[in-house]
A protein has these predicted regions:
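Intrinsically disordered, low-complexity terminal regions enriched in Ser/Thr/Pro/Gly
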Residues: 1-162
């Protein structure tokens, strides 16, 4: 019985820690490959080509779950914005016109989960000038209403002339 009690106490402490810490984006990483939770190949650097596609690994933590009979519902919303080195927002129609399925996760799981990740393939505009940019990734926990955002730096290289 002591092990069961210890397990319950540990779960309670973990829940309290999650609530105290609050909803956050634990990781946001530029990648070359993403296989599963915390199993990805980080990009060697931040260099990308105009018109290329960036692959992002995003790991939110301390998200809320809504209980529905014996299921738990995870509901997260995503938004991406591109900023240049002067912090001016640039329009990226492909990101703004992303489908609801690409901008939202609503998952039904058997038990409470604390680990979750999402990957995004974001096409860059072909007309980007060479220079430093930031991708602002915003994740909102629809259950708690809490939002966190991170900036992922990228450097757009020159287009090779042929």
């Amino acid at each position: 019985g002591d092990h069961k009690e210890a397990g319950k106490l540990l779960a309670l402490f973990n829940d309290e820690d999650r609530l105290a810490t609050g909803f956050v984006i634990e990781r946001a990483q530029l990648c070359t490959a993403i296989r599963r939770f915390r199993d990805y190949t980080p990009a060697e650097g931040d260099r990308v080509k105009p018109g290329g596609v960036i692959l992002l690994y995003v790991e939110p933590r301390n998200f809320g779950l809504q209980r529905n009979q014996d299921k738990h519902i995870l509901h997260l919303k995503y938004e991406w914005k591109l900023y240049d080195d002067r912090s001016t927002e640039l329009q990226v129609p492909a990101w703004e016109q992303a489908s609801l399925e690409e901008r939202e996760d609503r998952l039904s799981v058997n038990g409470p989960v604390t680990e979750f990740y999402q990957s995004f393939k974001l096409p860059l505009p072909a007309n980007l000038a060479m220079g430093h940019y930031r991708v602002k990734v915003t994740v909102t926990d629809a259950h708690s209403g809490k939002t966190d955002r991170v900036h992922v730096p990228i450097y757009v290289t020159a287009v090779e002339k042929r």
